[in-house]
């Protein structure tokens, strides 16, 4: 265990957890009971971020659930040949399952992890998002994976009840700054001897909790402003001052959400970082005083694969908060009002 902790600390330095990972509400992470950490699946290397959040929050060294063919398509990559990633994740405590042929025998080790007082990390099956949306169900999958199954099995057949919980984790990547925010949700529990309907209800409660804990950042707001200008055929050239004023007005209208502290502390700097990032993708052209958008490129929908984020970071960033009606309404309010459509932008916005 100590060797694994030291190894994970080294990995944390490589991935820059101290500088690039922000954990919110880490105090909610249970320290004295086993739990299942369930997180939205964003990138291939999500487990390292989830692990870092658990370590920072409570000093927990959770294991991982990973399918046995996770890196099958990457084995010819230079980085895979340089570092045997399968061996690397085993050092971190990975337990593998076969996605196409899951058996009780493969699931039993995860139940034993909980019964032994340890924890593990999992991601709802077949929901990895490539477009920025919180979940993308693919194939014939129509419901979230059953995290509650492991709680029910860990409690089953015991003389005394086992206190075990599911902890929702929500990862939000600010694509412009590279900062990851992981918000720890309130632990969810399953009543002992709960039936299948109660388990199913808990699984839906889990995905709702994950979805509600996305962090709102300046890059998403900037993306929304640009997208609405493109979608509604508004002016293609926007004043820098007016653009920043719209972003600030939208931010002030958002209440009851986790807000990126960098957006509050330095909104001009965060908006500028977002615009520079969008420029790299060819979506905007920047001058000292104005922003000129490329309407066709902003409205284009890239392939639903790993290139989506790079080809259209405007859509990707906006998709992160698309399920927040209050956030999208705030952006619409500041862009689609008569004063917001005036030449020069939104300097007069309240």
Task: List each language-model region with its residue ranges.
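Helix-enriched interaction subdomains in cytosolic or periplasmic regions
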Residues: 1-7
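Soluble catalytic domains of membrane acyltransferases
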Residues: 8-197, 201, 246-249, 257-265, ...
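Generic hydrophobic alpha-helical segments
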Residues: 25, 106-110, 206, 210, ...
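Short, structured interface segments
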Residues: 199-215
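Charge-rich, solvent-exposed alpha-helical interaction surfaces
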Residues: 205, 209, 224-225, 246, ...
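Positively charged, polyanion-binding regions of nucleic-acid-associated proteins
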Residues: 212-238
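Short capping segments at the starts of secondary-structure elements
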Residues: 231-246, 250-252
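Short, amphipathic alpha-helical interaction segments positioned at domain boundaries
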Residues: 296-345
């Amino acid at each position: 265990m100590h060797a694994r902790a030291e190894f994970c600390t080294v990995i944390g330095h490589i991935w820059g957890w101290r500088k690039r990972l922000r954990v919110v509400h880490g105090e909610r992470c249970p320290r004295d009971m086993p739990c299942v950490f369930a997180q939205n699946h964003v990138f291939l290397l999500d487990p390292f971020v989830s692990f870092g959040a658990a370590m920072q929050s409570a000093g927990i060294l959770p294991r991982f659930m990973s399918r046995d063919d996770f890196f099958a398509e990457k084995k010819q990559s230079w980085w895979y040949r340089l570092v045997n990633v399968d061996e690397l994740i085993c050092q971190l405590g990975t337990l593998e399952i076969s996605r196409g042929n899951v058996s009780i025998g493969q699931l039993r080790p995860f139940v034993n992890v909980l019964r032994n007082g340890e924890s593990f990390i999992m991601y709802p099956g077949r929901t990895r998002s490539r477009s920025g949306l919180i979940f993308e169900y693919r194939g014939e999958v129509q419901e979230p994976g059953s995290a509650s199954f492991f709680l029910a099995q860990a409690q089953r057949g015991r003389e005394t009840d086992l206190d075990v919980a599911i902890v929702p984790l929500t990862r939000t990547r600010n694509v412009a700054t590279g900062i990851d925010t992981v918000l720890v949700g309130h632990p969810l529990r399953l009543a002992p001897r709960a039936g299948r309907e109660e388990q199913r209800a808990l699984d839906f409660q889990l995905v709702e909790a994950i979805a509600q804990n996305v962090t709102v950042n300046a890059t998403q707001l900037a993306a929304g402003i640009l997208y609405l200008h493109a979608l509604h055929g508004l002016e293609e050239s926007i004043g820098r001052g007016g653009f920043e004023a719209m972003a600030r007005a939208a931010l002030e209208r958002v209440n009851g959400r986790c807000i990126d502290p960098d957006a509050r502390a330095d909104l001009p700097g965060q908006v500028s970082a977002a615009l520079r990032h969008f420029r790299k993708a060819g979506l905007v052209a920047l001058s000292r005083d104005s922003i000129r958008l490329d309407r066709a490129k902003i409205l284009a929908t890239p392939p639903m694969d790993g290139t989506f984020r790079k080809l259209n970071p405007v859509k990707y960033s906006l998709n992160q908060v698309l399920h927040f009606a209050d956030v999208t309404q705030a952006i619409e309010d500041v862009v689609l009002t008569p004063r917001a459509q005036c030449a020069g932008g939104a300097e007069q916005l309240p």
